[in-house]
A protein has these predicted regions:
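ATP-dependent adenylate-handling active sites, centered on carboxylate activation for C-N bond formation
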Residues: 8-16, 90, 131-156, 224-445, ...
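Polar, surface-exposed loop/tail segments
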Residues: 38, 99-103, 522-529, 541-551
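Glycine/proline-rich, flexible active-site/cofactor-binding loop segments
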Residues: 434-470
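Short Ser/Thr-interspersed hydrophobic loop/turn segments at strand-loop and sheet-helix junctions
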Residues: 47-57, 141, 245, 471-486, ...
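Structural motif
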Residues: 91-99, 170, 174-177, 458-471, ...
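Cysteine-centered catalytic environments shared across enzyme families
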Residues: 1-322, 326, 333, 337, ...
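Short amphipathic alpha-helical segments and their helix-coil junctions
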Residues: 84-92, 448-463, 509, 575-595
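PAPS-dependent sulfotransferase catalytic core
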Residues: 534-592
Length: 627
């Protein structure tokens, strides 16, 4: 795994700016502690920082083609590179290395951009073709690896992280209020947004073609992989592919099915070394770590269980600098990566299993809502409209109470994107904006988040399937994979996700939602198929996970930071939020019913830290956060 950055410029001046490229590379040096390199040629500057996983001795980048006419800066792993290499060698292509990077160049020189559809893996790369004066930015169809872009045909900048672009003298860091509004509602950035004005993401499965004369084209592509008929066979193939490395590979292990399945399959495939797994003992409930320990014992693998005491006052600013977006549940991801990075360079994660097999409560809730809408189509709306309005007048004066949210869900049955938004705590409406936001937000032209959701909502008649498709395209990519990439790379660890493998997903998608989740039972088919591999004890465990109760967490750990970052003076100075809302919540006793409100407070606090780091250019290491 690595980091890439650079630019394409119509003017031939790139060779005069090595210091600029070095500054951009320095911002992402944590992504590649094992080496770095630069390439300049006419209109192009390519930078690379390397974490060595495959071809440790000759895989340095940026990498030139054998004829010196093409150059690539690549972040990721190609799991089928050996198979592709053999095929290309048979056609006479001369290779100089044993790396997966050179295979990408060979595919391009042999097949053009059509060759990219043969790649199996996680990747984002920039490729320059001197012959045609064309450059390409490419991101994998699953969106596992990030790629940010800014600019236009005159000058297009890119980077594995937005901070690399911000290091270019042509850009300055400024918060995008509309993106912050999306973040406050979705708790991640859907679509191609970033939190910085003028910087966007290249969306998954896209090729951005830049040409010195003809301009920029955005080209969609997908992976050419045949769907199998057997999910277990496809899963075994995926895990086997994800063990491709010239270094030892470990596994994350929680108490659930997904990571246990990867460990069980990985143990069968790992013959040169004993498989190691890693578990974080933290959170509100130790049951998750206890279950992971039992899974490791049953599977016969080494488990490193690390008990960690939270000290957000020390690690939150650094975490935010890496994430570039305020996030609520990223601390445990970084702490687990730190544990694993002490032993291995690569870890496999069970991320994506719940998305593939309908494993979340929100899938079950949508199934129940769909059933209710068919049983009581007219009565439901009349009841919610008449009785609901009367009850709401007697509810808490706090905005967005749990009871009002449930009534809104019932009232909205049939409007499935809105129902989903309410289930996921999207709150956007004019009255709440006035309660929550300050003048800098209220004076901006903010997008209606429910309309944004409706515009992105898949056109599937089954609302549960539509929900799953939406979360695969947006929440998985821009929330879960985003956090996994940033927190692991901050620790010099590569994390791989077999459940997000394209050939595996194509096999799973041969089965419809009713087969994967019969009668609304989450992960039903997966449990049936994986029972022989894992046994009854693991399969029958209730779903748990690392949970942080936001009111308790905020009061226990963040109260000191709140005194520094959520003061009326600072809130007024930044102008983003309403100090009356903040003070009202801080004065209340922590309670479960305030969970939403404290999530909002947490995001507000981190947004203020974000402003100081990225807009005011304060080094996060200088923050005096300790009590």
């Amino acid at each position: 795994m690595c980091g890439i950055t650079g630019w394409f410029n119509r003017q031939v001046q790139t060779a005069d700016k090595p210091d600029t490229l070095q500054a951009m590379m320095s911002t992402i040096k944590h992504r590649g502690p094992d080496g770095q390199g630069k390439f300049f040629s006419q209109h192009v500057a390519l930078g690379h920082v390397r974490l060595s996983i495959i071809d440790l001795n000759t895989g340095q980048q940026p990498m030139l083609s054998h004829d010196k006419t093409a150059c690539i800066s690549f972040n990721g792993e190609i799991y089928n590179y050996q198979e592709l290499r053999r095929s290309l060698q048979a056609e006479g292509y001369p290779f100089n290395t044993h790396s997966d990077t050179e295979v990408i160049i060979a595919l391009y020189q042999t097949m053009g951009i059509q060759g990219f559809s043969l790649l199996r893996g996680m990747y984002a790369f920039a490729l320059w073709d001197k012959k045609t004066r064309s450059a390409y930015l490419v991101r994998d169809p699953s969106g596992i690896k990030p790629l940010f872009i800014a600019g236009d045909h005159q000058q297009l900048l890119f980077g594995s992280e937005a901070k690399a672009i911000l290091a270019h003298p042509g850009y300055h860091s400024e918060l995008d209020p509309n993106s912050l509004h999306s973040l406050m509602n979705f708790r991640y950035l859907p679509g191609n947004q970033s939190l910085f004005k003028g910087i966007t993401q290249l969306e998954p499965g896209r090729i951005l073609h830049w040409h010195a004369e003809s301009g920029i084209k955005d080209i969609p592509f997908s992976t050419e992989a045949n769907a199998g008929h057997n999910i277990i066979d496809a899963f075994e193939d995926s895990v086997h592919a994800h063990f491709t490395a010239d270094v030892e590979v470990g596994c994350y292990l929680s108490g659930g099915i997904d990571s246990a399945a990867i460990c069980a399959m990985g143990k069968n495939l790992s013959h040169e070394y004993q498989l190691q797994s890693f578990t974080l003992d933290a959170g509100d409930d130790p049951l998750e770590a206890d279950n992971a320990q039992r899974s490791a014992a049953q599977l016969g693998i080494i488990n490193h269980r690390q008990a960690i005491e939270f000290n957000p006052l020390q690690c939150l600013p650094e975490m935010l600098w890496h994430l570039e977006v305020p996030k609520i549940n990223s601390l445990q991801i970084k702490l687990l990566a730190q544990v694993a990075a002490k032993k291995v360079k690569v870890c496999l994660s069970g991320l994506g299993g719940d998305e593939a097999f309908y494993g979340y409560n929100v899938h079950r809730f949508m199934h129940q809502a769909n059933k209710l809408s068919k049983v009581l189509p007219g009565l439901t709306h009349r009841w919610a409209g008449a009785i609901g309005k009367q009850l709401l007048t007697h509810l808490s004066q706090l905005p967005f109470s749990e009871t009002s949210r449930k009534f809104s869900i019932v009232q909205s049955l049939g409007q499935w994107s809105k129902v989903y938004g309410l289930m996921r705590n999207i709150w956007d409406n004019p009255k709440l904006r006035q309660k929550i936001y300050g003048p800098r937000m209220l004076d901006s032209d903010l997008t209606d988040c429910y309309q944004q959701l409706e515009n992105l909502w898949p056109g599937n008649d089954d609302p549960v399937t539509a929900l799953a498709q939406f979360e695969n395209q947006h929440k998985l990519v821009n929330d879960l994979l985003w956090q996994e990439d940033r927190m692991s790379m901050a620790c010099g660890l590569e994390v791989r996700v077999p459940f997000v493998d394209q050939p595996f997903l194509k096999t799973v998608h041969r089965f419809n939602r009713q087969q994967l989740m019969p009668h609304g039972r989450t992960k039903s088919l997966m449990k049936e198929l994986f029972r022989p591999l894992l046994g009854d004890e693991i399969i029958q465990r209730p779903k748990s996970g690392f949970q942080v109760s936001s009111p308790h967490f905020f009061h226990q750990h963040l109260s000191v930071m709140a005194k520094q970052w959520l003061t009326p003076e600072r809130i007024t100075a930044y102008g983003l939020f309403n100090p009356e809302f903040v003070n009202k919540i801080l004065q209340l006793k922590p309670a479960k019913k305030l969970r939403w409100h404290y999530f909002i407070l947490y995001l507000m606090l981190l947004t203020h830290v974000w402003i100081e780091i990225f807009e005011n250019k304060t080094d996060y290491k200088q923050f005096e956060c300790a009590a």
